[in-house]
Amino acid sequence: MTQGPGGRAAPEPEAPTTFCALLPRMPQWKFAAPGSFLGRGPAAARVAGAAEAQPEPGVPALAAVLGACEPRCAAPCPLPALGRCRGSGSRGARGTPDVADEWVRKGGFIHKPAHGWLHPDARVLGPGVSYIVRYMGCIEVLRSMRSLDFNTRTQVTREAINRLHEAVPGVRGSWKKKAPNKALASILGKSNLRFAGMSISVNISVDGLNLSVPATRQIIANHHMQSISFASGGDTDMTDYVAYVAKDPINQRACHILECCEGLAQSVISTVGQAFELRFKQYLHSPPKAVVPPERLTGLEESAWGDGEVTADHDYYNSIPGKEPPLGGLVDSRLAVTQPCALTTLGGLGQGLSPAWRDVRGLPWDMGPSGAVPPGDGYVQADARGPHDYEEHLYVNTQGLDALELEDTSETPLQPEDSPKKDLFDMRPFEDALKLHECSVAAGITAASLPLEDQWPSPPTRRAPIAPTEEQLRQEPWYHGRMSRRAAEKLLRADGDFLVRDSITNPGQYVLTGMHAGQPKHLLLVDPEGVVRTKDVLFESISHLIDYHLKNGLPIVAAESELHLRGVVSREP
């Protein structure tokens, strides 16, 4: 303590107060890019001038995004911590400009290679760019990539390559074997080695990544851009591999591995980045309209495809594993979405073919408003605006009593649930092609007698629905014509009894009604695309489906139960 003028003790200087200490404790307050808070002194002005004049090359766009996502400050922080934050922010300000400034200056937030993109934009916007690579299989990812930080996501792709490199024989790519990462045991699941080791064609466009066998045009996977959440490749430790995480109905969320020898991995990952940037520009030119979702109905069944990463536990009888949402008749439900999504935490490919591209969020497209859904025969309608050409899908054996009570008591139109109306996975499973082939061989039909489109059906060019004719079904004793659910259930006496009926509410919808464990089941036989199918097998007609399961004694697997066809409930003459 020192003596001031007049002998009085001068007060001690107050400890410096951090900026966070002056703010109330409101965790929802968040300041983007604290490094941009410049001081008033000449030193700060020199720093700002240096940042504008001499940007440091080689810093990936990921740093700019992470700089804009500083952690929330919920409590006063000490001065040293603030100094570290201020120092890191200054480095970010010198090295990478703001993401918004980057978009204004260059028209994109992904750093292009020094020589520009490899392909013309018109080609990526149109037919796309194809590469011949080696498919290594995929490994299930049990956690949402959005819930993981960037380093963990990178480790997930590395660990997936590490596992498949040993499991797939004849690999030629350069890879240094590493010990299994036990920390990722709860994130990575089982592997799927079907088609592993095959030479395939990967087509990259603004629509997504399409994997197919060149010789037969068989579709292995078709991942839309909205379903791809992370991509990585061309690193120094994985120069011959590209890994990306995407969702599809067969593998759910999985990490797919492509082996690209002779430096092709960098070209592939660069083309993916170019396609994503062009898709994002399309999104900016046609942003979605905000739609106020209706109130969720209480006591009714939830949507089968859920919101975002969360899906309902109910299964469709004739859907593939993964709860593929129905298309709602002839109307493509991908053209409408109930809520716009924010594109956040976007990473870049880095300067000169950087290996990482992160967090490709869903790009919602809204092509029309949603409407009201009228009640219909105990089925949940997939698209409120679709024509009633096919009966709505039924949740099998879930809340059956509630559905019956609703059919008897509800007289007012129901409101649609606030579930998204876009199909994130626009692909029919590649297993369908094999099942169709096996089923044709079992029926004595050679592949040569079938049209090429039926030998290997292509997901985007599936033929239009062709409903069975009434004359064909009238020849079958188990067909009862137009009949309600309640009337059909009264005809069932024992387990295994079954009949086929035409829906009263939606003529042209054919439903299999059977008894299992004392409970009636109603199974939709024709999917929205006009294909007669079960969860595993495609059939030529409803008669083919019934005869196949009746003569072979095979059950129809519906959700987590089985429906056996033993006793035909014949119609009255």
Swiss-Prot record:
GO cellular component: plasma membrane
GO molecular function terms listed in the Swiss-Prot or TrEMBL record: receptor tyrosine kinase binding
Name of the protein described by the UniProt record: SHC-transforming protein 2
Gene Ontology BP term (one): cell surface receptor protein tyrosine kinase signaling pathway
One Pfam family in the UniProt entry: PID
Domain remarks in the Swiss-Prot or TrEMBL record: The PID domain mediates binding to the TrkA receptor.
Annotated ranges, domain SH2: 478-569
The organism of origin for this protein: Rattus norvegicus
PTM per Swiss-Prot/TrEMBL: Phosphorylated on tyrosine by the Trk receptors.
Subunit structure, interactors included: Interacts with the Trk receptors in a phosphotyrosine-dependent manner and MEGF12. Once activated, binds to GRB2.
Start and end residues of each PID domain: 125-307
Keywords: Phosphoprotein, SH2 domain
InterPro entries xrefs: CEP152/SHC-Transforming (IPR051235), PH-like_dom_sf (IPR011993), PID_Shc-like (IPR006019), PTB/PI_dom (IPR006020), SH2 (IPR000980), SH2_dom_sf (IPR036860), SHC_SH2 (IPR035676)
Transmembrane segments: none
Biological role: Signaling adapter that couples activated growth factor receptors to signaling pathway in neurons. Involved in the signal transduction pathways of neurotrophin-activated Trk receptors in cortical neurons.
